[in-house]
């Protein structure tokens, strides 16, 4: 076997043994030592928890208010009926949610074949048992909501979010969206030329019939590859820190002197000296203001007190005053 000692072997799909339409064995080899468990466990977890599918999520049965009741003429109690509906295998094309109906009367079993649906829905196992009617006059009618989802979502996880709008008699069902019912993998020894320390991965799985086992493994591998893409092109994706530009001047300095609500005498004196903004005022000294005509010590004291209440004072130095926004006016 030629190649670098650091070069990894690439596995190939050796065999697909179709035991039945819902049961298959898939064999991959050769794998580097340890990679049988690495890939087998990853694929197993994805197949059990992350495969999309359709499942019954809500049921309404005529004359039934809650799941802890029974229905006259029906052999099973409501909990058992819900459990049977939970195992219903449905394939839906092009929709995320459909409503199915079932109406049956007379003695005999009620199966998935009795469900009324449109052309977008396929009942994979029509013989799936739902309940038994035990009386000629007995009947059962129900509305079944089927939704598309992923993994497993218990009814308890949806109770709080739907409680306010869910009417009495609408029964929630644990939603098992995953089409994979059972999966196991086994790692066996494999050999390539002189190497005898390699792995062979054998995956055995059963589905509910809504997906072909080979297609299920293909989807699981695609999900795994997509999740690992970020690591292939690993780089620092941290966003550069955006520094907020601090204003050059305190906004209060850009406000007009009128906002200080000075007396009319003091305000007129400042305007006569072309002091229009608070920034203009704080740069003046007491001596400069006292030289202003008609502005005495009383007005000066008023100005100082008003500025102090805003954390300002006379005689302040402001670099680059006035700002462009004021200078252009």
Curated annotation (Swiss-Prot):
The keyword Transferase applies. One of its GO terms (biological process) is DNA-templated transcription. Signal peptide: none annotated. Its EC number is 2.7.7.6. One of its GO terms (cellular component) is DNA-directed RNA polymerase complex. GO terms for molecular function: DNA binding; DNA-directed RNA polymerase activity; protein dimerization activity. Homodimer. The RNAP catalytic core consists of 2 alpha, 1 beta, 1 beta' and 1 omega subunit. When a sigma factor is associated with the core the holoenzyme is formed, which can initiate transcription. Belongs to the RNA polymerase alpha chain family. This is DNA-directed RNA polymerase subunit alpha. It comes from Pectobacterium atrosepticum (strain SCRI 1043 / ATCC BAA-672) (Erwinia carotovora subsp. atroseptica).
């Amino acid at each position: 076997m030629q190649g670098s000692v650091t070069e990894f072997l690439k596995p190939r799909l050796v065999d697909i043994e179709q035991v039945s339409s819902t049961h298959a064995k898939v064999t991959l080899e050769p794998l580097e030592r340890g990679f049988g468990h690495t890939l087998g466990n990853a694929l197993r977890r994805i197949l059990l928890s992350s495969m999309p599918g359709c499942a019954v999520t809500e049921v309404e049965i005529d004359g039934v208010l809650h799941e802890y009741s029974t229905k006259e003429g029906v052999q099973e109690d409501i909990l058992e009926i819900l459990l049977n509906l939970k195992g219903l295998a449905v394939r839906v094309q092009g929709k995320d949610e459909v409503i199915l109906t079932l109406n049956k009367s007379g003695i005999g079993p009620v199966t998935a074949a009795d469900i009324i649906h449109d052309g977008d829905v396929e009942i994979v196992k029509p013989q799936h048992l739902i309940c038994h009617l035990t009386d000629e006059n007995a009947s059962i009618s129900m509305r079944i909501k089927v939704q598309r989802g992923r993994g497993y979502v218990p009814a308890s996880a949806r109770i709080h979010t739907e409680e306010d709008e869910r009417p009495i008699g609408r029964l929630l069902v644990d939603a098992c969206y995953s089409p994979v019912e059972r999966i196991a993998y086994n790692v066996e020894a494999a050999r390539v030329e002189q190497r005898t320390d390699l792995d062979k991965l054998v995956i055995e799985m059963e589905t509910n019939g809504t997906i072909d086992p080979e297609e299920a493994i293909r989807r699981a591998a695609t999900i795994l590859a997509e999740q690992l893409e970020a690591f292939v092109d690993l780089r620092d994706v941290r966003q550069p820190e955006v520094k907020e530009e601090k204003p050059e001047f305190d906004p209060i300095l850009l406000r007009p002197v009128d906002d200080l609500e000075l007396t009319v005498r003091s305000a007129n004196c400042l305007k006569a000296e072309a002091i229009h903004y608070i920034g203009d005022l704080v740069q003046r000294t007491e001596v400069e203001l006292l030289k202003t005509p008609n502005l005495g010590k009383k007005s000066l004291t008023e100005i100082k007190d008003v500025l102090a209440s805003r954390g300002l004072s006379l005689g302040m130095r402001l670099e680059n005053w006035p700002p462009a926004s004021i200078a252009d006016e």
